[in-house]
Amino acid sequence: MFFSLTLGLVASSCDNAANTNEDSDFRYLADEFADIKVIRYRIPGWEQLDLSQKEYIYYLSEAAKYGRDIFWQQNFRHGLEVRKTLETIINNYDGDKNSAEFKEFLTYAKRVFFSNGIHHHYAEEKFIPECDKEYFAKLMRDTGLEESVENMIPIIYDKSLYKYRKNISGEGDLLLQSSVNFYENVSRKEAEEYYSSIEDPEDPTPVSYGLNSKLIKRDGEIYEEVYKIDGLYGDAISKVVEYLDKAAEVAENETQKHYISLLTDYYKTGNLETWDEFNVAWVKDTSSRIDFINGFVETYNDPLGMKATWEAVVNFKDIEASKRTKIISDNAQWFEDNSPVDERFKKEKVKGVSAKVITVAQLGGDCHPTSPLGINLPNADWIRKEHGSKSVTIANISEAYDKAAQESPKNMTTEFSWDSKETELLKKYNTVTNNLHTDLHECLGHGSGQLLEGTSPNALKEYSSPLEEARADIFALYYLADPKLVELGILPDMEAYKASYISYIRNGIFTQFVRIDEGKDVTQAHMQGRKMIAEWCYEHGKENNIIEKRSKDGKTYFVINDFEALRSLFGELLSELQRIKSEGDYDAGKNLIETYGMKIDPQLHKEVKKRYASLNLKPYGGFINPDI
C-alpha cells in the first residue's frame, strides 16, 4: 500500500485489472527511477471466478501482505527503522517538495521501498542518497525525528557500515560481514559447526535445518531463535495465521483446508517436520483452481544457503495455457531417461511432477515487488524424489514485462543482434521459447536427477543457489533443441530453439552486465549461473569457433556459428553440474562459479553499459499489486 502511494500511484482494483483487456489507454509502465521500472499487471480471468473463489483469494492476499515486515527485518536488522523514517518524512514534510534535493531524497526512498531495504536487491551493495546528509538530517528534524538523527544518519550515509546485504567482497567473514539478519555475532565456522552437530547424514528425510530461525551467539552460547507465533516475528506471523484461518473457512475443498491447517500449525510451533508435512500435502493438490505459496521458502539471501526469506504468492490456474505444461509434465520420465547425465544420478521413477501456467493475484515478501517468472517447489530433495514437485509459469507477470518493454521506443534486440537475420529470428520465436524455457527449467530442470545416498543437501553451501539455477537452466537449454518438443506440439519447428540459444548466450556473456556497476563482480545467483554457462561454453568451444566474438562499427557481438555443437556443450556441462550436485562436490562447484561466473571483462563491461545507456532503458523491473 505504502509503496504504491509513494510512487504517486493508485493501484487498479482487481475488477479494473481484469477489465483492462479492453482498455486501450492502460499503461503497464507506471514509474521509472534510478535503474528501476515499476510495472502494473492485469489479472485476466478474474471475472470467471465465482464469489467464494474471490473471497478465498482475498484472505490469502491479506495473509500475503502481513508478512512484509518479516522480510524487511530479515534483510537488515535496522530495515524497519529506515522505512518508518522515510515514511514519516514523506507523510509529514511540508517544505518545498519541488526542490532538487527533495526529489533526490524521494528517489532514494523509492529505491529503499523497491529493494525492501538499504541494499540493492540484486547487486547486494548499500546505496547512498544523492542528497547530502545535512539535508536529510534537516528533513528528519522538520518531521519530528530529531532524536533519531544521530543513529539514523550513519546507517544511511556511512559507506563503511553495513556495506553488503550478503558479503560478496571475498574479504572478511562471510557471515560477520553480511548485513542480512539471519545470524547475530556468529562466524561462518561457528554456524557450519553448529549445524553439522545437529544434522543426521543418515536421515533419508531430513528437515531443512535452520530454514526458519536466526542463529545467535550470546555469552558464548550459540542457539536458534525460531520464527513462530510466540517467537521471532510473532506479531506478523499471528496476522498471517489469522487470515490463513479465514481463508480456510472459504477454501475450495477439504484438501486445501487440511494443508492450511498444517501450515498454521507450523507457524504456531516452528516445527520443521510439520513444514515438511505441509509441503507433502500441498504438492499432492493438483486439482484445485486456486493455489498459494506462503512461508519461509527460498534461501538465496543467506550467505550459507540455509535460512529462508518469507514470501507469498496467490494465484489461480490459467486453464488454457496449462495444456502446454501438462504435456511436459506427462512426459517427465522420458526427459529424465534421455538426459545426458550419468545413470547413477537419474531418478528411476519420476514421481508427481505437476506443471501449470498461473495468473498471479497478489505478490508478497521476497516476491514483491520483484517477482519470479517461474517457480518450482518444494525445495527439499527427498520430497521431490518421493512425492514430486509443483512447477508454475507465471503468465500475467511475463506478459506485463513484455508489454512494458513494448511501451519503450528502443529495445535491446536490435542493438545487440549481429544482423537482421538474428533480429527476425528473435522477434519470431523469442516469446515462445522464453516461455518454454521457463516451463522446462521449473517443471523438469529443478526436479531432475537425485542425490547419491549420504550426500548432504547442503554440501554445496554458498554455491548451491547459482549451481542449482545453472543446472535447471542448462537442462532446459539442452532439451529446447530436441525434436521431441516439435513431436509433442509445444515447439513450432526446429528453427525456434535457435532464438533461445542466441538470447541466452548473448545475455549470459554480455548484456546482463548492464545491471552491474563497472568494476564490480557478478553476485546474484541466477546471473552467476547464466554467466557461468555462457562463458564455459564460449571457452570450451573456442577451438571450433562454436561461439564467435565479432566486431562491427566499433561494437562487440557474440555470434553462434554451430548450434548443434553448442547443444553438445550444454549436454556436457549439464552432466557435470548434475554430478556436482549428486556427489556434493563443493570444490568443483566452487571452481565453476569462481572461474566462469563472477569476473567481468572490464572493456566489455564498459561497452555494454555505454550502449545500454543510449537506449534509455531500466534494467530492473518490479510490480504494483492490484487492490483486492
Q: Where are the regions a protein language model picked out?
A:
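An active-site-proximal "capping" alpha-helix that borders the catalytic cofactor pocket
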Residues: D50, N253, S465-D482
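Extended, compositionally biased alpha-helical segments that mediate assembly or anchoring
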Residues: F558-I628
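Short alpha-helix carrying the canonical HExxH Zn2+-binding catalytic motif
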Residues: T431-L444
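C-terminal motif of bacterial Sec signal peptides marking the signal peptidase cleavage site
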Residues: L9-S13
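Catalytic Zn2+-binding segment of zinc metalloproteases
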Residues: C443-T455, Y479, P483
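Long, well-structured alpha-helical subdomains associated
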Residues: F71, L477-I580
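Contiguous, non-catalytic segments that form substrate-binding/exosite surfaces or channel walls
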Residues: L106-K217, E224-E422, N430
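Post-HEXXH active-site segment of zinc metalloproteases
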Residues: G449-A470
